[in-house]
Structure formats: structure tokens, C-alpha cells
Amino acid sequence: MSYNVRAAIIGGTGLYSLEGMELIEEIFPDTPWGKPSDKIKIGKYKGKLIAFLPRHGIGHFLSPPEVPNHANICALKQLGVEEIVAFSSVGSLREEIKPLDFVLPSQIIDRTRFRNSTYFGNGVVAHAPFAEPFSPNLSKRIAQTAKKIGLEIHLDKTLVCMEGPLFSTKAESHLYRSWGADIINMTVLPEAKLAREAEIAYQMICMSTDYDCWREGEESVTVEMVIANLTKNAETAKKLLSELIHVLGNGDDLSLKNSTRYSIITAPEKRNSETVKKLRVLFPEYF
């Protein structure tokens, strides 16, 4: 791929395109992990060259466990992407996080069960640090932009990622609250883990659509409820992104550069050649 796109937007449920984007090209590349969720749009948005990828595909045909996260992140990495802002609907586990509120999580609890969450294994072992799963630098820029446009946004919250595709039971919802989790979704993992391994700064912007199913007297979450509230939030999300775009992809967060080099532990002579061949697409300088 001949582009050098430094910032990417991953759209979640309800966000399948970027209104106002001047399209240059759509690409649907092959990667060693297959094809991405859908065609990646490359274009200018408010004068900035960016990539846009709908996580669930246009028309929402991929459930959370089916999203080809390895291919998605690899394809964006090959474009030159250094920063990803990902959007997601979430359920609220806290009274103060109301439907239609925006949230910037800083921590994740992994409750997925069947998802491969790494590019490594199969003869090449690596252990990347993940204590801070989101980019503090990128999060700060998003928070500052939200303040600039007068958008209240909840900061430093804990996001629990469940397997899905079914929503939580009441017992699970109360359990996550007892753990200190604030919001819940099905898509931040392995997306955030793979972005970390790929040395891409990553932050998810979460939009609360419901109170999950823990709140007495409140209707439990439904797809209709999620879509209705995402539609209401569309204009606010667009306003935030139209300002945020100016502070993305400017080389402000290179803290992950070369970090994966020092996570690889397998001796060179013991590395599986087929795995090395795949990893070389992501990390040509390391293999």
C-alpha cells in the first residue's frame, strides 16, 4: 500500500461511514490474517488524510466474536497508521453514566472467552505490556477537544469486555459492578491488544446507550434501545470528531515505537518460519 495514513477511525455500531469525508480510494487488502471487516475508506476529512474502517462491516453483518481484528489492525498498520480512535456503544454500570453520555475508559477487564488476542504464538512468543491499555496521550487530546466544544465526558473509567453476542444476565451485570467496572461492551478486545502489539496508539470513545440490566425499574437493554440512542448521539459524535481530527496523526504519541521488539522472547534460531513470514508483514524491521 502506497499511502502514509497516520490516523484511523474505527466505527462501531451505527457508525458505518464518515459524513463529509472526501473519498480518495477504497481498499480491501489481503493480509496474512485474511481480509478486514469491510473496505477501508481513505480520504480527506477536514483537510486531514485519514482511514475509516467500519468494525462490523457496512450493514452490520459481523457479530463481535466474528470481527476480523487481526486483519483490521494489520491493514491499518500497513497504511502507516500510528493512532486509532475507535467508537463503540456501551452499557452503563453506574447511575451517573446516563444513556447518551460519552465515556473515555482508561482500563479494561477481559471477559472474552474464545478470541485469539495476539499476533504471536505458533513458534514465536512475545509478551507485550498492557498495564495501560489505552493511550494516555491520545485520551488527553480527546478530553481537551470535548471540553473545547462543551461536551461533558466521563474520564478514567473501567470498561469490561464480554464475549457476546448475547447481553449480560442480571447476575453478571451486578458482578461487574462489584468489581468496579463502569461500562460494558463486546468489542474493545482483542482490538486494543492487537493495536498495542502493532505499536499503534489506541483510544476508544464510548457512547452509553442503556443501563445494561442491573438497574431496578429500568428496561433491560435491547438492540432497538441501542440503535435509538446511537442515532440521537450521531450529531454530537460528528461534532467531536470534526474538531478532534486536527489533533490526530501529528506524531504526538510515539511512546510505543519499537516496544514490540523488546517483547519478543523466542531465540531467532527457534522461530517458526511460517509465523515469521506472517509477522514480517507487520514488523519488517524485526524479522
UniProtKB/Swiss-Prot annotation:
GO biological process: L-methionine salvage from methylthioadenosine; purine ribonucleoside salvage
Pathway the protein acts in: Amino-acid biosynthesis; L-methionine biosynthesis via salvage pathway; S-methyl-5-thio-alpha-D-ribose 1-phosphate from S-methyl-5'-thioadenosine (phosphorylase route): step 1/1
CDD domains in the record: MTAP_SsMTAPII_like_MTIP (cd09010)
Residues of the site described as Important for substrate specificity: 168, 223
GO molecular function, one term: S-methyl-5-thioadenosine phosphorylase activity
Binding positions (phosphate): 13, 55-56, 187
Alphabetized UniProt keyword annotations: Glycosyltransferase, Purine salvage, Transferase
Reaction equations catalysed: S-methyl-5'-thioadenosine + phosphate = 5-(methylsulfanyl)-alpha-D-ribose 1-phosphate + adenine
Residues that, per the record, bind substrate: 186, 210-212
GO CC annotations on file: cytosol
Coiled-coil parts of chain: none
InterPro entries (alphabetical): MTAP, Nucleoside_phosphorylase_d, Nucleoside_phosphorylase_sf, Purine_phosphorylase-2_CS
EC number, as in UniProt: 2.4.2.28
Function noted in UniProt: Catalyzes the reversible phosphorylation of S-methyl-5'-thioadenosine (MTA) to adenine and 5-methylthioribose-1-phosphate. Involved in the breakdown of MTA, a major by-product of polyamine biosynthesis. Responsible for the first step in the methionine salvage pathway after MTA has been generated from S-adenosylmethionine. Has broad substrate specificity with 6-aminopurine nucleosides as preferred substrates.
Subunit: Homohexamer. Dimer of a homotrimer.
NCBIfam families the UniProt entry points to: MTAP
Family, as annotated: Belongs to the PNP/MTAP phosphorylase family. MTAP subfamily.
Protein name: S-methyl-5'-thioadenosine phosphorylase
Organism: Leptospira interrogans serogroup Icterohaemorrhagiae serovar Lai (strain 56601)
